[in-house]
Amino acid sequence: MPMDLILVVWFCVCTARTVVGFGMDPDLQMDIVTELDLVNTTLGVAQVSGMHNASKAFLFQDIEREIHAAPHVSEKLIQLFRNKSEFTILATVQQKPSTSGVILSIRELEHSYFELESSGLRDEIRYHYIHNGKPRTEALPYRMADGQWHKVALSVSASHLLLHVDCNRIYERVIDPPDTNLPPGINLWLGQRNQKHGLFKGIIQDGKIIFMPNGYITQCPNLNHTCPTCSDFLSLVQGIMDLQELLAKMTAKLNYAETRLSQLENCHCEKTCQVSGLLYRDQDSWVDGDHCRNCTCKSGAVECRRMSCPPLNCSPDSLPVHIAGQCCKVCRPKCIYGGKVLAEGQRILTKSCRECRGGVLVKITEMCPPLNCSEKDHILPENQCCRVCRGHNFCAEGPKCGENSECKNWNTKATCECKSGYISVQGDSAYCEDIDECAAKMHYCHANTVCVNLPGLYRCDCVPGYIRVDDFSCTEHDECGSGQHNCDENAICTNTVQGHSCTCKPGYVGNGTICRAFCEEGCRYGGTCVAPNKCVCPSGFTGSHCEKDIDECSEGIIECHNHSRCVNLPGWYHCECRSGFHDDGTYSLSGESCIDIDECALRTHTCWNDSACINLAGGFDCLCPSGPSCSGDCPHEGGLKHNGQVWTLKEDRCSVCSCKDGKIFCRRTACDCQNPSADLFCCPECDTRVTSQCLDQNGHKLYRSGDNWTHSCQQCRCLEGEVDCWPLTCPNLSCEYTAILEGECCPRCVSDPCLADNITYDIRKTCLDSYGVSRLSGSVWTMAGSPCTTCKCKNGRVCCSVDFECLQNN
């Protein structure tokens, strides 16, 4: 579809939006405070005065609590989120200074589908969500844990994230679209992540989720709203993709119809039959008298069957005989001469040749043909007057035999005899019918066989699980021993009456046809279970269950360039540029791309007045020859810090800075745990209170205040009894396509877009499917003729994958 058409539709949506207005449909929003019935909740919350009096506000106290929704509320939330690409999470909060806590969380076990968190430890707002089944986190630096009232609204429109704080647009980002089809069993928590973690300390008011575009208007009605939203555009693109899918299906049907039409054009509309110069229409029937058959024209083909003759009940003075020009025998008077009975047309040689006609022997005169044989080979056929040579073909002249009988020559005559497997009808072998050997028990099929009647014969079929020995016998088939089975190599094959069965060996699971090794504790971080309780770990992990990360830095496995330092990551590592150096844009894993920052040329130094800036590797120096201007003072935040002055940063009470000879040096405050007035926020290692300890997310390990650890691709820290986690810092990659390998947390560069799991789709880069239909980048379709193969257009590349579970079920 041309882009100008997209813009036209976009304009129409925008115009319609302007006309309709932005009134909030109550069915498309959820008031969390009301749904959780906090008024009647006493443990851990108390109603207090809020930022305004239009709604109730609640203080979330610093004690264990369980503020979550009832099952029917969670089900309502599932329905509201289903297939939605636009929603806003908003609340009015007053958070205790320097604390961290979750404002709202929608979770299922360990998975945060939607979560809004405020960290006073790192002064940032975090949005946790799920994309394609994998956790994602957006960290937005902002200090909200300051004891002041704030209105926060986080809006998501497809891949567009917008954060408003106090009706000011703070951040706008492009993110991975979140999964909005929530699974059964999710739960909605307010003021906490779960029973023990993420406890919010402060007041929450107006907690809501709005399922409409620009939901922040509910909180800040005076804000301008844009038109259209990212989701509007996504809907248009999805509409185009749906049209492309419909076009592909219609193209396939059209191609099939054209093929059928082409075939029809090569044949007559009405199939006729031409026989002996006569034209018969479809379904016409006629009698082929020459061959005594009933024939029918069926779709241009002639089908003929032997004419069936009715049984004859001739009187005692008549006999059934064939009459020329007729297919069935008729009753005709018989003749008797000298005790011999003659049928109509039969002859007898006395003194003269006589023939039976109408019951009377009539004298006939017949010239016998000369014979080409010696006299001793002359024979007189039965009921004939002329002699023939021995070996004469009587069938060529003789009786008409039916389709299930055959003519047989004798010395002096020809007769009809039923074919094998047929029996004469009323004693007349010219007409024969099939013998059902199975029903008549005239077969020789042995045990473990089934008799199957066929025209003129029968067949002995083996029952399932048996194989043929000869035409009449079958024996049990050892499918397991012969290898003629479909059991997995890790399954036990057992012969059965019906064939065989497959059962997975101990330590393996599956249906017997497919068996996979089972590891009781699983294989973590992308490890593969290759044998019972045996894992093969991916690069970067070790342990019996791949549970241990290999610290490439501390174990000296790698060596970074001296301009960088080694930073360990789960399953991997990277060399991070040291202070005073930056990456040149090429990104080298070993840190060779780290080059010196020239603070002098960039004017990022702090040299004052007459002092000269001298660039050094990883830093700079201030050189002042002499004179009154060589004070060594340092410019700082629009002011001046004197040489030797020491101060604490306003935005970070745990850092202390000093000015020395024109250069500013900052460091973390030194901690003296012997000093009873030590700031435990800055020196958590000095906090020995049991209440300041933290349980990890799994509830298995206890950490002291100040301890750090890694969990689910996040760096976590225990501080005064509460756990605060933030995304691991990953290296900045300059490549077009990236992918996060199984078990790892940070992306790596890949050259093939089909391998990329984080890709920005360019709808201008289209793909051609197998029908020749152009597909937009990001489109997904099923491959023609292969229902288990799914294809996706990734910036001009068709990337297909096979669903092996689908193959097993089909």
UniProtKB/Swiss-Prot annotation:
List of residues binding Ca(2+): D434, I435, E437, N453, L454, L457
GO molecular function: calcium ion binding; heparin binding; protein kinase C binding
Glycosylation sites: N40, N53, N83, N224, N294, N372, N511, N562, N609, N708, N732, N758
Keyword Disulfide bond: yes
Database matches in InterPro entries: ConA-like_dom_sf, EGF-like_Ca-bd_dom, EGF-like_dom, EGF-type_Asp/Asn_hydroxyl_site, EGF_Ca-bd_CS, EGF_dom, Growth_fac_rcpt_cys_sf, Laminin_G
Domain Laminin G-like: 64-227
Keyword vocabulary terms for this entry: Calcium, Cytoplasm, Differentiation, Disulfide bond, EGF-like domain, Glycoprotein, Nucleus, Repeat, Secreted, Signal
Location of the EGF-like domain: 434-475, 476-516, 517-547, 549-587, 596-631
Location in the cell: Cytoplasm; Nucleus envelope; Secreted
Any one annotated GO CC term: cytoplasm
Functional note: Plays a role in the control of cell growth and differentiation. Promotes osteoblast cell differentiation and terminal mineralization.
Note: It has been demonstrated that ROBO3 binds to both NELL1 and NELL2. However, NELL1 is not expressed in the spinal cord at the time of commissural axon growth to the midline and has no significant effect on commissural axon repulsion in vitro, suggesting that NELL1 is not a functional ligand for ROBO3 in commissural axons. It remains possible, however, that NELL1 functions as a ligand for ROBO3 at another spatiotemporal location.
Name of this protein: Protein kinase C-binding protein NELL1
Species, as recorded: Homo sapiens (Human)
